A protein has these predicted regions:
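Accessory recognition modules or surfaces
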Residues: 2-6, 19-21, 52, 60
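Generic N-terminal amphipathic, Lys/Arg-enriched alpha-helix
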Residues: 4-19, 33-40
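C-terminal binding/interaction regions
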Residues: 11-12, 96-166
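Residue-level signal for short, function-critical loop segments
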Residues: 14, 45-47, 139
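Short, charged/polar "capping" segments at the starts of alpha-helices
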Residues: 18, 76-79, 141-145
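Alpha-helix N-cap and loop-to-helix initiation/capping positions
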Residues: 22-26
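Acidic/glycine-enriched connector segments
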Residues: 28, 32, 36-38, 43-125
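Short, hydrophobic alpha-helical segments
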Residues: 172-180
Length: 180
């Protein structure tokens, strides 16, 4: 499966949406960079939030990429925003664990930017599942708190730190390659 497109999850803040233009732009560029690498952006499609993950999906579409939105609830009408989600996976599950489990396990690796409790949950699921994690530095939230660390004493995998979107994508691709 040498030519298989990889599914790169972008996990980021929905929280109170008080992030500034710099984080919004960084998330969009992250999505563009995944698209430029020829891979797929997977993100948590939120009906009621314009999260950093959603910004990454927009960026991917701006660069001609493919996006997969994993949403909560039931029925395809849960997702009303159009134009930047190519494939929608409706889990029938709620936020807070169930939907995040499906989201993360649909990814070959994840990149976290800032992040509240949902991003923390997604990072923990990735860690437990040995799915590579890269975090964007200086973005606040759980990405910054867990960057460069192991989540627990088992030392399964470290949340690697990247400074730029290009570096983040390069790191996830290398981690996936190493993982085999």
């Amino acid at each position: 499966m040498k030519d298989k497109k990889l599914q790169i999850g972008i996990m980021g803040s929905a929280q109170d949406l008080n992030y500034g233009d710099a984080l919004r732009d960084l998330a969009r560029e992250l999505g563009r960079e995944v698209a430029r690498s020829g891979n797929i952006v997977v993100y948590g499609a939120e009906k009621d939030y314009d999260s950093l993950s959603t910004q990454a999906a927009r960026g991917a579409k701006e660069a001609g990429g493919t996006t997969v939105g994993v949403t909560y609830g039931k029925g395809k009408d849960i997702w009303e925003q159009e134009g930047f989600t190519d494939i929608l996976i409706v889990t029938g599950l709620e936020r807070g664990g169930g939907r995040e489990f499906v989201l993360v396990n649909s990814c070959d690796a994840i990149i976290a930017i800032s992040g509240g409790s949902g991003t923390l949950t997604e990072m923990a699921i990735a860690y437990q599942s040995n799915i590579p994690i890269v975090v964007m530095s200086d973005t606040g939230g759980w990405a910054e708190k867990l960057g460069g660390t192991y989540i627990d004493a088992r030392n399964r995998l470290k949340a690697e730190i990247a400074v730029t979107p290009k570096e983040a994508v390069s790191k996830v691709l290398e981690l996936i390659r190493q993982r085999g």
